Amino acid sequence: MEVETASGTIRFKLNGQACSIASNPVTRTSDVLREELGLTGTKVGCDAGDCGACTILIDGEQRFACLTAAGQLEGCDVHTVEGLAKDGKLSPLQQAFHRYGAAQCGICTPGMLMAAQSLLNVKPNPSREEVEDALGGVLCRCTGYSKIVAAVLEASGTETQELPADADSGFGSRTRKVDGEPKLLGTEIYGADTAPDDSLWMRVVRSPHPRATFVLPSPEKIIEENPGLMRILTWQDVPGNNGFGIYPHIKDQPVLAKDQVRYRGEAVAALIGDRKSIEAVTDDDLGIEWVPEDAIESYESALEGKISPVQEIHENNLLARGFLKKGDAESVYEQSIIKAQGSWETSYVEHAYIDTEAGYAVKRGQRLELFVSTQTPYMDRDEVAQVLGIAPDQVRIIPSAVGGGFGGKLDCSVQPLLAVAAWILE
């Protein structure tokens, strides 16, 4: 296999075959595998070496592809999940994963398989503790790890559990996951795994401040200086309502902020073009003038009225009120022999899925197609329609495989931004 790009040639073995790439030696190996070689079985979650989804084997050792520079591959023997199955037949390790249902959402599965394989290569009959240690660098949000550990132990012959026989049909019968095999082969398609070959890329510019006003200069000069940069989208480019939200009557989250940001990371502009060009333009190049304001850092300060409202449409910073009452609670309380009062609060809980929020959009005539990682395609359709100012039946949402969601992908993230870009640029 040989890929010609722009820099010096890097030669190595990939899944048993000679491979030669002409990449920048500091390019992430995860990008080389996914973008240049088309091996999207290696997943990218955190891009920082925390989640382990991108685990591959380099000379038999576990390595995070997102932290490994392409230049480090020179002369190495590299293995990815695509190399486990032979002639389309699952390896014993993959078969054990399938039998135990160890691949659930599937986003961590390639990393888990490679981590397990690295152990089995040197320790064919490991102990449970050794299996757990070998898998320790790969996070899983779905399984609780038990099925994964059991699958590795069975593949090694160390331990085997008696499982009910698979059945073709019948309520209550055990059957294997219908989408288990693609997840084990690394062929399941998630939001970041595919896009048309001629797609443009988007990079969103986000606020570095939790609260601020800002002025975004005219982008014409930046576009002139960067030929591969097609467009810089701002709030003025939103054809419909520049707001969305999960409440039907409240659409207060701007697609792109107008002149004020209300949280760190709020989108203020979107750069559209080829990948190299949009990555070359830094946030500082845009010349955004920021005026930081006092941030609301707790609900107490938000309700005290000493800081201006986050949204002018929400008086006293209250989004919604809840009320629940049934029966004569007061008299029952007074008649109770034992009374207790207290105040309780819970911490913020992150859904913690590893799958990235990603997708692509294409305008076809007067309709928009949006391929995206989502749990709620119909909610996405309605949100995108009102952002574009078109009818819902002009929007088609094509859900990708979802690498974890747990309710965290009920609301929109990249959907409005992709939709506006595709609709404007056609």
List each model region and its residues:
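Short glycine-rich loop/turn motifs
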Residues: 51-52, 200, 258, 355-360
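Buried hydrophobic positions in well-ordered alpha/beta secondary-structure cores of metabolic enzymes
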Residues: 29, 78, 108, 142, ...
